[in-house]
Regions:
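Flexible, polar/low-complexity N-terminal or interdomain linker segments that lie immediately upstream
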Residues: 1-36, 110-123
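Short loop/edge segments at beta-strand edges and connector loops
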Residues: 12, 49, 95
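Short active-site oxyanion
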Residues: 22-28, 43-44, 63, 89-90
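A generic "binding-loop/recognition-motif" signal
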Residues: 33, 51, 97
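Acidic/glycine-enriched edge-of-secondary-structure segments
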Residues: 33-46
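Glycine-rich, highly charged phosphate/nucleotide-binding loops
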Residues: 46-53
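Catalytic cysteine-centered active loop of the rhodanese-like fold, especially the PTP/DSP P-loop
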Residues: 55-102
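Short low-complexity, flexible loop/linker segments enriched in glycine and/or proline
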Residues: 105-109
């Protein structure tokens, strides 16, 4: 059974960045559509086109972090509750999402991701 709306396990930007930097084993899932994922996402993220694809790929005992654009985006909240309702035990939501991640100057991937290469003339 899904917990009440107010009872959501979260992860903050610093902890998520540390987990990624250390190479911790967990699944990072962007809860937006494919277009948004292709535009930009946090490195190491996964995107699933369908619920069937998602649930056949994730194991209920895996640690899963879900995110979308910001605290005001409810796609990750809905996915969080869907996973918990299906007995996924280690689920957390990164509420700050892409907006907070990008504002902190952390790396992004995708067609619209800002380039992190040093500026200067091309060789």
């Amino acid at each position: 059974m899904a917990p009440p709306i107010g009872n959501v396990r979260t992860i903050d930007r610093e902890e998520l960045a540390s987990k990624l930097q250390r190479g911790d084993r967990f699944r990072l899932v962007m809860a937006l559509n494919e277009w948004a994922f292709r535009a930009k996402h946090i490195p190491g993220s996964e995107h699933f086109n369908t619920s069937e694809e998602l649930f056949s790929s994730l194991h209920p005992d895996e640690e899963v972090v879900v995110y979308c654009t910001s605290v005001d985006c409810h796609a990750s909240l809905a996915l969080y509750h869907d996973l918990v309702a299906r007995d996924y035990r280690e689920v957390r939501r990164y509420e700050g999402g892409l907006t907070e991640w990008e504002e902190a100057g952390l790396p992004l991937e995708g067609e619209w991701a800002p380039s992190r290469s040093p500026s200067g003339p091309a060789d």
